[in-house]
UniProtKB/Swiss-Prot annotation:
Keyword hit for Metal-binding: yes
GO biological process, one term: choline biosynthetic process
Cofactor remark: Binds 1 Ca(2+) ion per subunit.
Source organism per UniProt: Rhizobium meliloti (strain 1021)
Active site per database record: C54 (nucleophile), H104
Catalytic activity: choline sulfate + H2O = choline + sulfate + H(+)
Chain residues that bind Ca(2+): D14, Q15, C54, D296, H297
Protein name as annotated: Choline-sulfatase
SUPFAM superfamilies membership: Alkaline phosphatase-like
EC number: 3.1.6.6
GO CC terms in record: cytoplasm
Gene label: betC
Its job: Converts choline-O-sulfate into choline.
Length: 512
């Protein structure tokens, strides 16, 4: 039975560099399932995160709002229950909504519109990872990134992250089977299942069978070598110091092994994606299901000597986005887009009036773009977390990228002429066009942001959370970490059930 609305499968991964997906996965990646998905997808070449860090990126992804609006500035900022997310919009429209995997919600609300959450999260839900602008330069050792992920890169058959993602995939597939059993029910609802993996996020450790795929890989060396600390821009210097770079001797072999493990973990994820699509196919739901593949932010992978994220360079800020399914014409789109566009796009595809969604989002629907009408709005990004001493903002429009922080010199890059972002045109304009472009971006920035107010809001949020966190660590502790609930008496075979009805209802397809 069809409801007239598409089912939706969102596959989200963590820290996947968008430069590796120029038109689907790069040729050298062993990713047959993602390559097959790309062939039938609308592919967005220049898609960007709203903020290059997990929790703010994901909160913005779900709401379609910038961090300055969600107030999820960092990995320990509470996500308020009153903020509408795509799960809320779809649920209002009659969808069943569920999450398997990571979303890094901070605070007592661990659902944010999802009716069901199949797993716990992999990261803490409390305020413990709060940075502190009052102490610039302080390195909080027990949770800040360090380069141990790079020097320790290699092979393992099980890790904390593998254990998590194996569970995420298993429970997601089980949920798809359960949903397929309802296909013939007159009262069934369309569904939106979000499956959110933590790979290929560091640590850079991969299973042997995927590691071996990249034995002869020619892409294990960064395009831009390590830039000395004193030649880096100020924010990159702060990132290096926050990652404790001076206490790690990162060798060329460490870099190669880290990148190899990262590529291997893309192949690991590809296998998981293949399992999900295979389940959709065998349960006859594929043709009625929209599939959206995305990442929260990227990873620098040693380019410029930088690792992880936390900046607006392409490796950190640019992320894959592919959408496949009924009504979606396959093709490559080059106009810059944003993860903020996902919520209005999902609403549009689900037949929800955008007038109901527009007040609650900073993004735009990509459906017109898929149908040939280009997106014209600039792409906005923000960062106000560890390694920053004041908020940073960025604007991507046309071939240009502009970066601003009140503490630092401005940056302007021409990404057509300088895709590796080696020439800052704000410092060395080539002529009047560059100067006029810089002036236009300054005006745009002033129109979009009150940087003093932004900074004050971040500082107030951090200070409040430090007070609350220290208090809650004294005495009895009530965790906010999500605990999935299962009713054992309603599973499998129990004496209060009609066993004949049970066996028939659990079978799908039936009568074959």
């Amino acid at each position: 039975m069809t409801t007239g609305k598409p089912n939706i499968l969102i596959i989200m991964v963590d820290q996947l560099n968008g430069k590796l997906f120029p038109d689907g996965p790069a040729d050298f990646l062993h990713a047959p399932n993602l390559k097959a998905l790309a062939k039938r997808s609308a592919r967005f070449h220049n898609n960007y995160t709203s903020s290059p860090l997990c929790a703010p990126a994901r909160a913005s992804f779900m709401a379609g709002q910038l961090p300055s609006r969600t107030r999820v500035y960092d990995n320990a900022a509470e996500y308020q229950s009153s903020i509408p997310t795509y799960a809320h919009h779809l649920r209002r429209a009659g969808y069943y909504t569920a999450l398997s995997g990571k979303m890094h919600f901070v605070g007592p609300d661990q659902l944010h519109g999802f009716e069901e959450r199949l797993t716990t999260d992999i990261y803490p839900a409390d305020f413990g990872w709060t940075p502190d602008y009052r102490k610039p330069g302080e390195r909080i050792d027990w949770w800040y990134h360090n380069l141990g992920s790079v020097t320790g890169a290699g092979v393992a058959e099980i890790t904390n992250q593998m254990e998590y993602d194996d569970e995420v995939a298993f429970l997601a597939n089980q949920k798809l089977y359960q949903l397929s059993r309802e296909n013939d029910d007159e009262s069934r609802r369309p569904w939106c299942l979000t499956v959110s993996f933590t790979h290929p996020h560091d640590p850079y450790v991969a299973r042997r069978k995927f590691w071996d795929l990249y034995e002869d890989c020619e892409h294990l060396t960064p395009e831009v070598g390590a830039i000395p600390l004193d030649e880096q821009d100020p924010h990159s210097q702060r990132i290096m110091l926050s990652c404790d770079y001076q206490n790690f001797d990162v060798t060329e072999e460490n870099v190669r092994r880290s990148r190899r493990a990262y590529f291997a973990n893309i192949s690991y994820l590809d296998e998981k994606v293949g399992e999900l699509i295979d389940t959709l196919t065998r349960t006859r739901m594929l043709d009625d299901t929209l599939i959206l593949f995305c990442s929260d932010h990227g990873d620098m992978l040693g380019e410029r000597g930088l690792w992880f994220k936390m900046n607006f360079f392409e490796g950190s800020a640019r992320v894959p986005l592919m959408i496949a399914g009924p009504g979606i014409a396959p093709g490559l789109h080059l106009t810059p887009t944003s993860n903020l566009d996902v919520t209005p796009t999902l609403a549009d595809l689900a037949g929800i009036s955008l007038e109901e969604v527009r007040p609650w989002t900073d993004g735009v629907s990509l459906v017109p773009m898929v149908n040939g009408v280009e997106r014209t709005e600039p792409v906005l990004m923000e960062y106000a977390a560890e390694a920053s001493y004041a908020p940073l903002v960025a604007i991507r429009e046309g071939k240009w990228k502009y970066v601003y922080c009140a503490l630092d010199p401005e940056q302007l890059f021409d990404l057509e002429a300088d895709p590796l972002e080696l020439t800052n045109l704000a410092e060395n304009p080539r002529g009047p066009v560059d100067q006029a472009t810089l002036t236009a971006f300054r005006d745009m920035r002033a129109a979009h942001w009150d940087m003093e107010a932004f900074d004050a809001a971040v500082r107030e949020s951090q200070a409040r959370r430090w007070v609350v966190y220290e208090a809650l660590r004294n005495g009895a502790y009530y965790p906010w970490d999500h605990q999935p609930l299962q009713k054992a008496s309603e599973r499998y075979m129990r004496n209060h059930m009609n066993l004949d009805t049970l066996e028939e209802s659990k079978r799908y397809p039936r009568g074959e």
